[in-house]
Amino acid sequence: MVNEYKAHSSFILKVVITLIGYWIASILAIIIYSMFFKIETNTFLLCLLLPTPIIWFNILIGMGLTYRCMENLTIYDKHKLWCVFVRDLTLTILATILATLTTMELYQIEHPLKPIEFVFIVGLVLIVGFTIITTLIIKYLKIIKNLKKISKN
């Protein structure tokens, strides 16, 4: 038998992960594009700010629906769903960072920056990405620890 609330929560969380991944990818793409191809500041800010409220509004609606569905689940099922959410979010962000680095390499071939600038930008992307991924992995491990405690009880 399928738990209807668990299925709804799982699906909505996957949609939220997709929206977060799209938002991060679009922000990184705009920033990287503006570094290699000089664009006006107004255009840059418009590209950054235009999709953000729309995407985050949808993310908030999705999280609200998830919270509503999760009210009917057991504590174990809630932790299990959050565990899957954090795991999938980590993989999505990792894939986005790797795709960004690949894009930067291709842009560097076509429209080269100074080597020191390029190395600095790549280092910055790696440091920020490593920090976010590490934070998510720590959160994942905490959720796993809580799952073990709950399953023992």
Swiss-Prot record:
Sorted UniProt keywords: Cell membrane, Membrane, Transmembrane, Transmembrane helix
Membrane-topology descriptor: Multi-pass membrane protein
Subcellular location: Cell membrane
InterPro entries with a match to the protein in the record: DUF5418
Native organism: Methanocaldococcus jannaschii (strain ATCC 43067 / DSM 2661 / JAL-1 / JCM 10045 / NBRC 100440)
Residue spans crossing the bilayer: 17-37, 44-64, 118-138
Pfam families associated with the record: DUF5418
Origin superkingdom: Archaea
Family of the protein in this entry: To M.jannaschii MJ0129 and MJ0554.
Main location per the UniProt record: membrane
The keyword Cell membrane is annotated on this UniProt entry: yes
GO cellular component term of the entry, any: plasma membrane
Origin organism lineage: Archaea, Methanobacteriati, Methanobacteriota, Methanomada group, Methanococci
Name recorded for this polypeptide: Uncharacterized protein MJ0587
